[in-house]
């Protein structure tokens, strides 16, 4: 039985679609996006605590964010904050954490999650993860959490579920699907067995290490060499030398789409990847004109369907805008139509 629950939190992204709030020096996972007094990574840790103590949580992040992680999660052991010398996508990031966990926790049962998503119904989230952990505790199985779609979304990948297993709520995965066009997304919604891929995975340590050895032998051999230095003074130098030699590849391409033992647990817990200003607007409280705001004293006159985020400013006044983003951070101001928000990446360069 794999009953030693561990959690891996991926926190290396730069959140470029949320400029100017999110910057390469201080990306969105470390920001109080919702105006609740907690950053997204702190909210992630908070909702996982009933499942797993902080001492059993691991954060994988870019070297330059290590200081921020230590500040925001002060009770996390320093050994559990893993530094990526450079971004190599999610497969090397997850493999590094799993190999390090395995060295001290051979019976680990693991949850992998992004750091920058939002969950509204935390008790249902905890129930779903506990169910998945129970399934993987004694099986050679990878469980991916599928989010029941509420709309024909073109910004997410999808999981196609096949036949149910003998365990209630858990289905075999038929296929992973790339981000669809609108027509295909509408077909997925109508079919009823397609779910959003939230990037939340559950597996035991032997299942994932065997899968990586089978489908990504080069990655496994690099990890084996790195592991010789884990928990020693040489670790930083060895990881700094070897990690950048890993192929840049996502865990979906590296393992999920190849493995035979993939299952999904469809869920509804108010999930959003907070991938855009538009998605943030829909999740924040709105006034009767559809405006959402985060800040101390934001006054809107004759405005409709706007999102205003200016937590640093003592007073902001906006008049006469319809469907706009107004965001200020560290002396940088963005005023942009929500219809054009896909261009924000280039605006922030």
Cite the ranges covered by each PLM segment:
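Left-handed beta-helix
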Residues: 4, 205-349
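Short beta-strand segments
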Residues: 9-11, 60, 111-114, 144-148, ...
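General beta-strand structural signal in soluble alpha/beta enzymes
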Residues: 59, 82-83, 112, 143-145, ...
């Amino acid at each position: 039985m794999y009953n030693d629950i561990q959690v891996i939190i991926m926190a290396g992204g730069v959140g470029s679609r949320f400029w100017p709030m999110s910057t390469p020096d201080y990306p969105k996972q470390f920001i109080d996006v919702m105006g609740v007094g907690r950053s997204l990574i702190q909210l992630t840790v908070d909702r996982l605590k009933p499942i797993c103590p902080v001492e059993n949580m691991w954060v994988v992040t870019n070297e330059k964010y290590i200081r921020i992680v230590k500040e925001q999660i002060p009770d996390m052991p320093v050994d559990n904050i893993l530094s990526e010398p450079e971004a190599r996508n999610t497969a090397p990031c997850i493999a590094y954490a799993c190999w390090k966990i395995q060295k001290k926790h051979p019976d680990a049962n693991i949850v992998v999650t992004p750091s920058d998503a939002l969950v509204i119904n935390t008790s249902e989230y905890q129930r779903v993860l506990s169910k998945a952990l129970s399934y993987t505790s004694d099986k050679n199985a990878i469980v991916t959490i599928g989010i029941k779609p509420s709309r024909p979304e073109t910004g997410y990948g999808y999981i196609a579920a096949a036949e149910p297993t003998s365990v209630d709520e858990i289905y075999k995965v038929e296929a992973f699907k790339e981000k669809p066009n609108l027509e295909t997304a509408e077909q997925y919604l109508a079919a009823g067995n397609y779910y959003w891929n939230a990037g939340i995975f559950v597996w035991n340590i032997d299942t994932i290490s065997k899968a990586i050895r089978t489908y990504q032998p080069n990655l496994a051999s690099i990890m084996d060499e790195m592991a010789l230095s884990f928990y020693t003074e040489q670790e930083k130098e060895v990881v700094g030398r070897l990690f950048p030699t890993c192929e840049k590849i996502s865990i979906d391409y590296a393992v999920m789409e190849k493995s035979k033992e993939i299952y999904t647990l469809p869920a509804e817990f108010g999930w959003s990847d907070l991938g855009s200003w538009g998605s943030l607007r829909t999740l924040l409280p709105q006034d009767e004109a559809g405006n959402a705001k985060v800040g101390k004293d934001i006054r809107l006159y004759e405005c409709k369907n706007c999102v205003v985020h200016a937590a640093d400013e003592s007073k902001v006044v906006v008049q006469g805008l319809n469907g706009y983003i107004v965001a200020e951070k560290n002396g940088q101001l963005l005023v942009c139509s929500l219809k054009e928000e896909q261009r924000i990446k280039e605006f922030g360069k």
